[in-house]
Amino acid sequence: MCQWAATKGTRNHAYEREKLERAFAKILRHRDPSVPPRRSDPRPRKEVARQWRKPHIYSPADLRRMLDIARSYPSPRAALRQENMYTMLLLAYCAGLRRGELARLDLGDVNLGDGTITVRQTKFFKTRILPLPDSVVVSFGPISLHGVGSAHSRLLTPPCSGTNKAVPAPRQEGSPGCLQTSYVVPG
């Protein structure tokens, strides 16, 4: 065990080693109550937790570059990909939405008059209403025009009926309601 303990010097390895030493100390103390209790070292756990909590904050220049790339993302087979990518990035950044929340947004969840968006089926199974900046509300213009008008039309995936003839072409790891789905306009 000493050889294994000395092999790696990562923070996660130190935390795992501390957990293992604590388990062995418990076993020894259970077998022989005269063994003094081992004081655990909280530092490895705190270092691992600190390492995983560091978010990456994009600079305004990085965000502008991502949004410009999303607006010019070429796709001859998916007519609405540019608008979808741009709106997804904007909502993720400005409203703090998660991927699953973005995928489940419906046109009925967006209230352009109030400038709010209703997020349903969140990570903790709650519904919340978020205010949106005017710049984000303006970006919904082109996407809401593609909707058939039903409140249950997906916001970030085009409808498959009406004037837009986009047909879902699911990838191997996706399904039609998933962000991994491509839409093909038959030609």
Curated annotation (Swiss-Prot):
Q: Which residues form the Tyr recombinase domain?
A: 53-187
- Can you name one GO molecular function term for this protein? DNA binding
Can you tell which superkingdom this protein's organism belongs to? Answer: Bacteria
Q: Which GO terms describe its biological process?
A: DNA integration; DNA recombination
Q: Does the keyword Chloroplast feature in the UniProt annotation?
A: no
The UniProt entry, under Gene3D superfamilies, shows: Intergrase catalytic core
Keyword presence, Protease: no
Q: Which InterPro entries match?
A: DNA_brk_join_enz, Integrase-like_cat_sf, Integrase_catalytic
Annotated catalytic residues? R98, K123
Cite the entry's keywords alphabetically.
Answer: DNA recombination, Plasmid
Family to which this protein belongs: Belongs to the 'phage' integrase family.
Q: Know the name of this protein?
A: Uncharacterized protein y4gA
Organism equals Sinorhizobium fredii (strain NBRC 101917 / NGR234)
Q: What is the lineage of its organism?
A: Bacteria, Pseudomonadati, Pseudomonadota, Alphaproteobacteria, Hyphomicrobiales
